[in-house]
């Protein structure tokens, strides 16, 4: 006996009753150790804190789904350790930091920043077998005012990259860094861990069309007046990431070319949103805290502080000054991205031609994930200093009839 298949007439097509909820892409959503994306992200150095925030007071940090204790010993060396003491499991968050490392509050076992157990005061001769009680640890290095950790296979540890726009500072220049907040130009938030998936924020870098709608027409002018011009866009897969060129024909006869970059595994390079001309001067890292949170770290080359001051989103108010009704009426990046859910349901998406950059970035990222799964080294990972300088491509460039404007301080 054949099964009767109900026919839905046009009047009832699209009923929510018939909707089958989608699901996140499992290859992209999970960041824990052993997952495809988790192992991919662990092959790169990840910022975990501002250098200035790492002191001799232990602090808990959560990165890539792991809870860890971060501190700086009295000799000035940062350390990142598994928090449960290898003696009987007490948290090293309650430890005291000394010249050589961190001492557990319970029975006084002392661990160096590389996890070596240096002293067991209740044991004969300070612990005859203390070398067997090594505390799990991750290597850390400091650069650009940030503390970076490598959380991948030890035998695959790359050199810490350098970025050309943050190198060879001229007299009077310095690097300004911040952490937290859902986007570099918005308010800092009390909890630096933003409550949704890191990829929802990072892939936004390759979506120039949302700037035309969300930031320029739907919610009024949130950035610069010329963003309300619909651009012509070209996306390009490059070694180490994806970039786009967006061209706008301005009313004064000039043409504006804007270049954004998304670099593996989670780096963004965006020029000034006031559209001032010249090479971009800052980069950001969109670091996965876990599957449902991320944290931003940003570094800017500058001569003046205040590069990350909050913008005025509406009626002269910054984001934290807006009421909930104003955020509903004039949403920005946080509302659009958090509105997708803690982890978006990729299975429900209907990507269109304007999503070419998103599709390209995801496809390129999946290729890098596959390389890691096959035992290879993903793009942007290098094992000698000579190859570790990364060229950043971003900027606002104005073309006139006789020249291109490129410089701005």
Curated annotation (Swiss-Prot):
<dbReference type="Pfam" id="PF00355">
    <property type="entry name" value="Rieske"/>
</dbReference>
<feature type="binding site">
    <location>
        <position position="87"/>
    </location>
    <ligand>
        <name>[2Fe-2S] cluster</name>
    </ligand>
</feature>
<keyword id="KW-0058">Aromatic hydrocarbons catabolism</keyword>
<comment type="similarity">
    <text>Belongs to the bacterial ring-hydroxylating dioxygenase alpha subunit family.</text>
</comment>
<keyword id="KW-0223">Dioxygenase</keyword>
<keyword id="KW-0001">2Fe-2S</keyword>
<feature type="binding site">
    <location>
        <position position="215"/>
    </location>
    <ligand>
        <name>Fe cation</name>
    </ligand>
</feature>
<protein>
    <recommendedName>
        <fullName>Phenoxybenzoate dioxygenase subunit alpha</fullName>
        <ecNumber>1.14.12.-</ecNumber>
    </recommendedName>
</protein>
<feature type="binding site">
    <location>
        <position position="104"/>
    </location>
    <ligand>
        <name>[2Fe-2S] cluster</name>
    </ligand>
</feature>
<keyword id="KW-0614">Plasmid</keyword>
<feature type="binding site">
    <location>
        <position position="85"/>
    </location>
    <ligand>
        <name>[2Fe-2S] cluster</name>
    </ligand>
</feature>
<feature type="binding site">
    <location>
        <position position="210"/>
    </location>
    <ligand>
        <name>Fe cation</name>
    </ligand>
</feature>
<keyword id="KW-0411">Iron-sulfur</keyword>
<dbReference type="GO" id="GO:0051537">
    <property type="term" value="F:2 iron, 2 sulfur cluster binding"/>
</dbReference>
<dbReference type="InterPro" id="IPR036922">
    <property type="entry name" value="Rieske_2Fe-2S_sf"/>
</dbReference>
<keyword id="KW-0560">Oxidoreductase</keyword>
<feature type="binding site">
    <location>
        <position position="107"/>
    </location>
    <ligand>
        <name>[2Fe-2S] cluster</name>
    </ligand>
</feature>
<dbReference type="GO" id="GO:0009056">
    <property type="term" value="P:catabolic process"/>
</dbReference>
<dbReference type="InterPro" id="IPR015881">
    <property type="entry name" value="Ring-hydroxy_dOase_2Fe2S_BS"/>
</dbReference>
<dbReference type="InterPro" id="IPR017941">
    <property type="entry name" value="Rieske_2Fe-2S"/>
</dbReference>
<keyword id="KW-0520">NAD</keyword>
<keyword id="KW-0408">Iron</keyword>
<dbReference type="GO" id="GO:0051213">
    <property type="term" value="F:dioxygenase activity"/>
</dbReference>
<keyword id="KW-0479">Metal-binding</keyword>
<dbReference type="InterPro" id="IPR050584">
    <property type="entry name" value="Cholesterol_7-desaturase"/>
</dbReference>
<dbReference type="GO" id="GO:0005506">
    <property type="term" value="F:iron ion binding"/>
</dbReference>
<feature type="domain" description="Rieske">
    <location>
        <begin position="45"/>
        <end position="149"/>
    </location>
</feature>
<comment type="function">
    <text>Degrades exclusively diarylether compounds having carboxyl groups in the 3- or 4-position. Yields a hemiacetal that spontaneously hydrolyzes to phenol and protocatechuate.</text>
</comment>
<comment type="pathway">
    <text>Aromatic compound metabolism; carboxydiphenyl ether degradation.</text>
</comment>
<comment type="subunit">
    <text>This dioxygenase system consists of two proteins: the alpha subunit (PobA) and a subunit (PobB) that acts as a ferredoxin and a ferredoxin reductase.</text>
</comment>
């Amino acid at each position: 006996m054949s099964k009767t298949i109900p026919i839905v007439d046009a009047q009832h097509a699209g009923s929510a009753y018939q909707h089958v909820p989608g699901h996140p892409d499992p290859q992209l959503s999970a960041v824990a150790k052993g997952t495809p994306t988790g192992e991919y992200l662990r092959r790169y150095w990840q910022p975990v804190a501002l250098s200035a925030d790492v002191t001799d007071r232990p602090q808990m940090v959560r990165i890539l789904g792991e809870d860890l204790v971060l501190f700086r010993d009295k000799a000035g060396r940062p350390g990142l350790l598994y928090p449960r003491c290898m003696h009987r499991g007490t948290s090293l968050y309650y430890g005291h930091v000394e010249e050589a490392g961190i001492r557990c509050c319970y029975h006084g076992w002392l661990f160096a920043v590389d996890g070596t157990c240096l002293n067991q005061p209740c044991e004969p001769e300070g612990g005859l077998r203390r070398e067997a009680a090594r505390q799990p640890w991750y290597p850390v290095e400091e650069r650009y005012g940030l503390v970076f950790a490598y959380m991948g296979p030890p035998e695959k540890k790359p050199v810490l990259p350098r970025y050309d726009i943050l190198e060879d500072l001229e007299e009077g220049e310095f690097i300004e860094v911040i952490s937290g907040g859902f986007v570099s130009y918005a308010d800092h938030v009390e909890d630096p861990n933003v409550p949704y998936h890191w990829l929802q924020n990072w892939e936004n870098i390759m979506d120039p069309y949302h700037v035309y709608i969300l930031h320029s027409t739907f919610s009024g002018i949130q950035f610069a007046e010329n963003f309300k011009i619909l651009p012509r866009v070209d996306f390009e897969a490059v070694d180490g990431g994806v970039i786009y060129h967006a061209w706008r024909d301005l009313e004064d006869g000039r043409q504006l070319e804007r270049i954004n970059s998304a670099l593996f595994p989670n780096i963004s390079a965006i020029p000034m949103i006031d559209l001032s001309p010249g090479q971009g001067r800052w980069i950001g890292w969109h670091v996965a805290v876990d599957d449902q949170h991320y944290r931003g770290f940003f570094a800017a080359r500058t001569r003046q502080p205040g590069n990350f001051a909050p913008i005025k989103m509406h009626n002269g108010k910054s984001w934290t000054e807006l009421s909930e009704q104003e955020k509903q009426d004039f949403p920005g990046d946080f509302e659009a991205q958090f509105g997708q859910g803690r982890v978006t349901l990729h299975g429900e998406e209907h990507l269109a031609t304007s999503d070419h950059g998103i599709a390209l970035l995801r496809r390129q990222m999946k290729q890098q994930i596959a390389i890691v799964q096959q035992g290879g080294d993903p793009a942007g990972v290098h094992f000698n200093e000579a190859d570790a300088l990364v060229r950043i491509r971003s900027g606002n460039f104005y073309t006139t009839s006789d020249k291109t404007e490129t410089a701005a301080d």
